Amino acid sequence: VSYISSLTLKVADLERFITGWNDSGKEASLRVANDVWASQAIMAGERAGEISVIYHWDSIDAAMDGVVALRNDPGILKTLSDSGSETVRRVLVRVDAERGGRNGKYVTLLTSISDPIAPEAQTAAVDRVWEVVSRHGGNGQMWGQILAGGPMTGTYILATTADSLDTLLEGTAEIMASTEQQQYFADHNATLTGRTMSRRLE
């Protein structure tokens, strides 16, 4: 088990944010977090345009201490100020499973609610879904649950990275049409609550 914290921002000057991120923000983040990457929501309803910065941690304590350290980093503070960035939310996610890598031009995020899922049932679902996704251009997937996130607490998430969303969504359609997936939803009283499509910021 590992954890991620997701910082969501509204950014007035995206070019300045990206410049600051590349000049110092990413490097400063990697001094305290295991991994970090940023994305911009493109197809996301009322969230369109928001920036998300994803930090990977070994523990909740590391996430708590790391966030405090990053909020006091002079370079990061300057980037946030210069780009007119405003914090929208920060959530903590328990990562239950990962497949593949984290690289890709795009990121999709599916959210759902359901009854509690036994580890063995989740592992079987992860492997079944990844087998299809990996054949349709998926570079990697991360499954988890929001542990602290206001009204989103308890929500399950599935993040997928890919270089083509057209190809990826063909795989998603195959999964959703399968009897196995429909049975999984029925067994766990699961309901999809949202999907966002984002581009990675480099």
Q: Language-model features: where?
A:
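Short S/T/G/P-rich N-terminal loop/turn motif that feeds into the first structured element of a domain
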Residues: 1-202
